[in-house]
Structures are given as C-alpha cells and as structure tokens.
C-alpha cells in the first residue's frame, strides 16, 4: 500500500531492494484478484496516450500497462507517455524508457498547472491506510483535474470492513480490531471505496461512476499462499507500528503473540484470506 500521509498512515514503506521486491509481488497478487486485468476502464486503448499512476511506488503498474498497450498504436500516431507520481521518490526505478517520467506529487496537494487536463487515464491504488475522513473528496477533485475531458480515473482499493474482518483466525481478528480502533481514533477513512463513489457522484465534472468488487477466494487458489502472505504482511505490519507507538509495556511480546499466532492459524487450518478488492471508475465530462 502506498502512503500519501506518512505522519498519519498505519504503516510506512521502507526504502531498499527487499521492499521493492515486496511491492512488486503485491502488484502481481492484486492484479490476479481483479481477474488479471490491468485496465478496467471502458476506453479504447488506441485513445490512451498519456497515463498517470498516482502512488506509483516502483512503477510496476506502469511497466505492466505499457507491455499491454504498446503493441496497439495510438490513434494520433504519437508514442505514449507514462508518468509515475508519488509523494516519495524512494522506490522510483533508477532506469526506465525515455517515455517514462517519475515525479514527486502528493494527491492531497494542489495539482501543478503543468499536469492539469493532461491525462487520458489516471490510476490510483491502495491509499486506504493513508487517508483521513474528507481526504477522498480532495483526492477525487485533484484526480479529476489531472484528466482531459473524456479521460478516466481507475482506483483499485481495499476496504476496512473486509480487509481482515472475515478471516477465521482469532489472532487476525484481534489485529484487525486493533487497527480499526486506531484508524477511528485518528479520524482515518475506513471505507475509501464508498467515499470515492459518494465524492465522484457528487462531483460536477465526473460521470459514469461505477464500482466492481472482486474477492480473494473467488480469484482462485493459484496464488493462495501469495495472497495470504500479502494480506498477513499488511495486517502484522500495521499492528506492529501501532503497538510500538503506544508505548505499552509488553508491546513486543504482544506483537509476537499475535503475529505468530495468526501465521500458525493460517497454516494449521488451511485458511484462504477472505477479503475484497474494489475497482472504482469515473469519467471526466
């Protein structure tokens, strides 16, 4: 998950090759859950010329999209432009094609003039751990400003309800409750998908708002272990940061009990992490 507000986020992303590898594996799992389709917006690929990926991280989503789109010539005969935007450059690739560009931008900050009305497609993914209540309205407005008329937003997101709340493990549910209470105390947005739909439907420059929900279990067992690993990492990392920040005596022992217990539950009971991933769409008028 990318972090747009690290001072309030449930967890942060560390620099380094190990973290890049984790983010790239997470990408593979998340795309698998949404039926291995990168592009869900109903848009003619030949009309997609300029693309922005907000919270881009390592840029792997842009790499994958380019592999999908580039065999298809653009309608105007120009090469595509791929822009990765993130509030931190820590994971930007050191080497990339000439038509790829990476820049620092926080989606909750005013849109630079040079980016307004520029893109045919703007993609966002996994900001659930970083947005306070009301932030989704700001993000949606800024995303709309990035688009040209007729362009699309595609936002792939988790929700606080199904993130870890349906997993049949007492230890996972304890961690889920701890994280939810922390987010509520900090005034963070627990249901980003619902907030997106509400904000996009109310936005005067957006239309054709939609939401599709994909389930981890229904995605099939091929990546079961990887799905479990990605979601368990998210759950345990969030828990660890909250416990460490609390200063509570015995926090380290409590984290060990919860994390090791959750892993044992999953292995012993053959659990397949039951959660939803939402694909949210909106088109600029």
UniProtKB/Swiss-Prot annotation:
Keyword Transport listed: no
EC supergroup of this enzyme: transferase
Single biological process term from Gene Ontology: methylation
Domain of life: Eukaryota
GO MF terms held by the record: methyltransferase activity
Pfam families from the UniProt entry: Methyltransf_12
Keyword Methyltransferase: yes
Pathway connected to this protein: Secondary metabolite biosynthesis
CDD domains (alphabetical): AdoMet_MTases (cd02440)
EC number: 2.1.1.-
Keywords, sorted A to Z: Methyltransferase, S-adenosyl-L-methionine, Transferase
Signal peptide range: none
Family, as annotated: Belongs to the methyltransferase superfamily. LaeA methyltransferase family.
Role of this protein: Methyltransferase; part of the gene cluster that mediates the biosynthesis of gregatin A, a fungal polyketide featuring an alkylated furanone core. The PKS grgA synthesizes C11 and C4 polyketide chains in the presence and absence of the trans-enoyl reductase grgB, respectively. The polyketide transferase grgF is then responsible for the fusion of the two carbon chains to produce the furanone skeleton of gregatin A. Next, the cytochrome P450 monooxygenase grgG accepts performs the oxidative cyclization to furnish the gregatin scaffold and leads to the formation of desmethylgregatin A.
Protein name: Methyltransferase grgD
């Amino acid at each position: 998950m990318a972090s747009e507000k690290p001072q309030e986020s449930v967890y942060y992303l560390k620099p380094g090759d190990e973290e890049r590898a984790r983010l790239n594996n997470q990408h593979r799992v998340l795309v698998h859950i949404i039926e291995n389709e990168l592009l869900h917006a109903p848009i003619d690929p030949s009309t997609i010329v300029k693309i922005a990926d907000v919270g881009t991280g390592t840029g792997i989503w842009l790499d994958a999209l380019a592999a999908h789109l580039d065999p298809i010539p653009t309608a105007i005969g120009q090469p595509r432009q791929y822009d990765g935007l993130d509030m931190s450059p820590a994971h930007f690739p050191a080497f990339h094609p000439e038509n790829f560009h990476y820049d620092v931008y926080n989606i909750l900050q005013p849109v630079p003039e040079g980016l307004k009305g520029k893109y045919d497609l703007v993609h966002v993914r996994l900001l659930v751990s970083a947005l306070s209540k009301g932030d989704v309205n700001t993000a949606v407005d800024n995303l709309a400003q990035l688009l040209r008329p007729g362009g699309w937003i595609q936002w792939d997101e988790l929700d606080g309800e199904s993130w870890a709340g349906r997993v049949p493990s007492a230890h996972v549910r304890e961690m889920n409750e701890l994280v939810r209470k922390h987010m509520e105390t900090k005034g963070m947005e627990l249901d980003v998908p619902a907030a997106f739909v509400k904000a996009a439907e109310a936005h005067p420059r957006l239309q054709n708002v939609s939401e599709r929900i994909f389930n981890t279990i229904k995605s099939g067992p091929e990546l079961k272990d990887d799905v479990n690993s990605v979601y368990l990492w998210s759950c345990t990392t969030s828990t660890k940061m909250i416990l460490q920040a609390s200063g509570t005596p015995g926090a380290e022992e409590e984290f060990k009990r919860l994390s090791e217990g959750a892993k044992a539950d999953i292995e012993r009971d053959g659990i397949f992490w039951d959660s939803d991933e939402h694909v949210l769409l909106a088109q600029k008028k």
